C-alpha cells in the first residue's frame, strides 16, 4: 500500500525546485498523489477497508490544502503542477 523508496526518490527528483528539496509543496503533492493512486487500487479489491479509507480521505484533504496554498502563491506554478500530475482541476 505504500510507495517504494525508488518511486519516492523519482518523484522528489522530478518535482524538486532545487537540489535536495524534499519539502516543497510540489514534491509533497506528487508523493501524496502517488499514495492516493495506490490506495485507490487497493479499494478495488478491498471495498470494506474503512480504516484505510479514512487515511485516504485525510491524504486527499492534505493534498487539497497544499494545492490551495500553491494556487494562492503562484497560479502558473499551480496550473503546471496539476497538468503534469493529471489532476482534474
Swiss-Prot record:
CC per GO annotation: cytosolic small ribosomal subunit
Cysteines paired by S-S bonds: none
Recorded GO MF terms: rRNA binding; structural constituent of ribosome
Keywords, ordered alphabetically: Ribonucleoprotein, Ribosomal protein, RNA-binding, rRNA-binding
Keyword rRNA-binding (UniProt): yes
Gene3D superfamilies: 6.10.250.3130, S15/NS1, RNA-binding
Function: One of the primary rRNA binding proteins, it binds directly to 16S rRNA where it helps nucleate assembly of the platform of the 30S subunit by binding and bridging several RNA helices of the 16S rRNA. Forms an intersubunit bridge (bridge B4) with the 23S rRNA of the 50S subunit in the ribosome.
Family named by the database record: Belongs to the universal ribosomal protein uS15 family.
Protein name per its UniProtKB record: Small ribosomal subunit protein uS15
Organism the protein comes from: Dinoroseobacter shibae (strain DSM 16493 / NCIMB 14021 / DFL 12)
Name of the coding gene: rpsO
